[in-house]
């Protein structure tokens, strides 16, 4: 029976011990310190350091708090350890400092493992007294946590400077190519961190260039020590009136706050007694009255729990001993009696005086600064308002690549309005919002004539006129013949041009050189008119051609251009003599065309006879010259009519190779020119046909196909004008 119980209990004990071992292994941190030695009973303590790392320490079951504290200090290689302590939370969620003179298991009731936190216990009133760089680094980490948690309140300007020191210590000098304002949003410095603060931190960080991490941390501490609540250990209490107050323990004394208002300060030398009983804390202060006599004032505060009251009392005793005494109070070796009143707690560590006098900095120390916790980066909306653009073109280009941000300085579109000026202006075609009828295109700035877009005589911009023309007139015939009309409102100009034809020989040669290579037919111009504004979508090729081609422009045709056309026609007549067979064929064609045409009016365009003299040549030489002249005139006519478009039903056009232009010299007195009801009639003269043997070519004004009727009013009849025949072509 006894053996059975022994085996059963033994197995249970072994099984229980194995489960504890597995639990300790699972709960161990990345850094493990086995300090239990050969002890059979082991406890595991897990300590959270200031840099965010965890350390697990195995200790004997009856180990005291000082043993755990020494293991952590040895792991950190920290000499100035009296400023720090290990803190834990009890079942009532009251924070306590681990007492080095008592057992860990008796103090920390929650475990195993027993969780503790390394924190700064006493904030040095003068950070320059901290000799070790590691000590200052840990102080900076503690203050950073205090500001982030809201325990240490900080003004905006001071918070910006402290955050900039943190960036300088962790990231080094600011680099334009590597660092951007959005980088600040990856860090957290204050509870409520706005974009304005992040931009201010970023700009302040640039000013701290050249500081080493140690220098930045020293400047951080020297700035933080002037904060009102620096190093204040706050405890919430209640007074006799039932209102909540806060007692703050500082190196100089005890502060009393009502809400956020400081209402009193009790200096340590003036405090004569400080004790507690259950949840009541008694504070006796000696002050001088008006007569110079000392008077005692007693203050009684209540706390929610007796443990909280005792914790406040112990913290007050430690602050008084550390900052005010040269050395700790020695405990008496003999007992005062069987009955002992009050707590036996006494501060057993070194004082600030001892720490600054005895500790000396080592010659060489090395430690690793761990990076801070990063958060997701956010895009700053205020970035554009803080950066002045240097080049509007660069910003506009970047805005077209990404539509999420609004570009700076986007130029407003130039409206297309009618103008009396015929000069070319710079018009910027602006993108419009995408609709069902339009699509967005790239913006272009092209030379464009304003009158070209608004001229009522231009077929591309007057769709309504074309519609009305097609309704009232006959449909366009097949392109067997091309009738060329003249505008009678240029009569006086032609008189002056006839006198200067001899001076335009060089211009004619240049025109023939430019028209040697014929451009291909351009696509038609797309016109879109909405309710807001008129937008003409032109390709660059079409737009330039519309400007260069005077036949499509509604403005006045330059005189030199008309002179060149006239000169080409005159030279063709002077150099060409028709063969008998060709003349016979042409006369027959003219007679057929004359039967279907209308009579000309008497307001004929005169031609100076002095400048138009027929040239007679042999039939063998005129054959080759006729072909060259025909090609040149064909190029001129094609350049004039290449951009005209027909909005009616497109007729069947034969191959370009089958169309051969032939110049016809009318022999009859009257020929027709234009559609029925729209052509202007001119009267021919018999004297010209009989005297010269063939009709002379009359110099036309700007040439327009009869599909686009001239809006100029007809001139009155002039009997003094001499009548000439009009040149026509047959395809």
Curated annotation (Swiss-Prot):
Entry's Gene Ontology cellular component terms: adherens junction; cell leading edge; cytoskeleton; cytosol; focal adhesion; nucleoplasm; photoreceptor inner segment; plasma membrane
Coiled coil start-end: none
Role played: Plays a role in the formation and organization of tight junctions during the establishment of polarity in epithelial cells.
Source organism of this protein record: Mus musculus (Mouse)
Biased composition (Polar residues): 378-388
Gene3D superfamilies: 1.20.80.10, Phosphatidylinositol 3-kinase Catalytic Subunit, Chain A, domain 1, Pleckstrin-homology domain (PH domain)/Phosphotyrosine-binding domain (PTB)
Region (Required for interaction with CRB1): 29-119
Membrane listed as a keyword: yes
Chain ranges of the FERM domain: 43-327
Gene coding for it: Epb41l5
UniProt protein name: Band 4.1-like protein 5
Region (Disordered): 352-388
Pfam family name, one: FA
Assembly mode: Component of a complex composed of PALS1, CRB1 and EPB41L5. Within the complex, interacts (via FERM domain) with PALS1 (via HOOK domain) and with CRB1 (via intracellular domain). Interacts with CRB2 (via intracellular domain). Interacts with CRB3 (via intracellular domain).
Keywords recorded for this protein, A-Z: Cell junction, Cell membrane, Cytoplasm, Membrane, Methylation
GO molecular function: cytoskeletal protein binding; protein domain specific binding
């Amino acid at each position: 029976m006894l053996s059975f119980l022994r085996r059963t209990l033994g197995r249970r004990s072994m099984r229980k011990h194995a489960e504890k071992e597995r639990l300790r292994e699972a709960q161990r941190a990345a850094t493990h310190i086995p300090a239990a030695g050969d002890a059979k009973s082991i406890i595991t303590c897990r300590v959270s350091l200031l840099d965010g790392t965890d350390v697990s320490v195995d200790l004997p079951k009856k180990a005291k708090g000082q043993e755990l504290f020494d293991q952590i200090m040895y792991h950190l290689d920290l000499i100035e350890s009296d400023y720090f302590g290990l803190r834990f939370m009890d079942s009532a969620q009251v924070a306590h400092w681990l007492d080095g003179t008592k057992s860990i298991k008796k103090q920390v009731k929650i475990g195993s493992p027993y969780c503790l936190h390394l924190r700064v216990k006493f904030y040095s009133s003068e950070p320059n007294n901290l000799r070790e760089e590691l000590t200052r680094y840990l102080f900076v980490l503690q203050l950073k946590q205090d500001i982030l948690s809201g325990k240490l309140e900080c003004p905006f300007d001071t918070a910006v400077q402290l955050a900039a020191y943190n960036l300088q210590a962790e990231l080094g000098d600011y680099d334009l190519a590597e660092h951007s304002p959005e980088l600040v949003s990856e860090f957290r410095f204050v509870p409520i961190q706005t974009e304005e603060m992040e931009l201010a931190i970023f700009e302040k960080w640039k000013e701290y260039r050249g500081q080493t991490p140690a220098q930045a941390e020293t400047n951080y501490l020297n700035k933080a020590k002037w904060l009102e609540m620096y190093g204040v250990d706050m405890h919430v209490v209640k007074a006799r009136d039932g209102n909540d107050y806060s007692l703050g323990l500082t190196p100089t004394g005890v502060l009393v706050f009502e809400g956020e208002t400081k209402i009193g300060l009790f200096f340590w030398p003036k405090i004569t007694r400080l004790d507690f009983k259950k949840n009541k804390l008694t504070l006796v202060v000696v002050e001088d009255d008006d007569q110079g006599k000392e008077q005692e004032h007693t203050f009684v505060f209540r706390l929610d729990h007796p443990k909280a009251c005792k914790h406040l009392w112990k913290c007050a005793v430690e602050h008084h001993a550390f900052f005010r005494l040269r050395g700790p109070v020695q405990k008496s070796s003999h007992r005062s009696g069987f009955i002992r009143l009050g707590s036996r707690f006494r501060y057993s560590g070194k004082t600030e005086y001892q720490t600054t006098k005895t500790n000396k900095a080592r010659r060489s120390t090395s430690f690793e600064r761990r990076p801070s916790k990063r958060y997701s980066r956010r895009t700053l909306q205020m970035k554009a308002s803080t950066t002045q653009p240097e080049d509007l073109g660069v910003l506009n280009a970047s805005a077209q690549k990404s539509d999420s941000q609004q570009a700076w300085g986007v130029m407003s579109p130039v409206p297309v309005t009618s103008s009396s000026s015929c000069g070319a202006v710079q018009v910027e075609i602006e993108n419009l919002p995408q609709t069902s009828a339009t699509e967005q295109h790239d913006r272009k700035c092209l030379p464009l004539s304003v009158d070209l877009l608004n001229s009522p005589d231009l077929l591309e911009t007057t769709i309504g006129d074309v519609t009305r023309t097609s309704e009232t007139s006959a449909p366009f015939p097949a392109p067997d013949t091309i009738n060329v009309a003249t505008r009678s409102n240029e009569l006086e100009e032609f008189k002056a041009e006839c006198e200067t034809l001899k001076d335009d020989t060089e211009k004619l040669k240049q025109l023939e050189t430019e028209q040697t290579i014929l451009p291909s037919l351009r696509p038609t111009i797309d016109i879109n008119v909405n309710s807001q504004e008129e937008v003409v979508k032109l390709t660059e090729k079409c737009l330039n051609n519309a400007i260069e081609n005077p036949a499509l422009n509604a403005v006045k045709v330059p005189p030199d251009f008309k002179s060149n056309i006239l000169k080409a026609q005159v030279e063709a007549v002077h150099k060409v003599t028709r063969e008998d067979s060709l003349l016979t064929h042409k006369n027959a064609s003219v007679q057929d065309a004359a039967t279907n045409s209308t009579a000309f009016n008497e307001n004929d365009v005169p031609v100076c006879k002095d400048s138009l003299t027929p040239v007679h040549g042999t039939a063998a030489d005129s054959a080759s010259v006729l072909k060259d002249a025909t090609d040149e005139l064909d190029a001129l006519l094609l350049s004039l009519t290449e951009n005209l478009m027909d909005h009616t039903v497109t007729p069947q056009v034969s191959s370009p190779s089958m169309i051969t232009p032939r110049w016809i010299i009318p022999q009859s007195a009257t020929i027709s020119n234009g559609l029925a009801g729209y052509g202007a009639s001119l009267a021919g003269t018999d004297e010209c046909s009989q005297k010269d043997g063939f009709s002379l070519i009359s110099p036309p004004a700007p040439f327009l196909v009869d599909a686009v009727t001239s809006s100029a009013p007809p001139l009155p009849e002039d009997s003094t004008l001499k009548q000439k025949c009009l040149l026509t072509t047959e395809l």
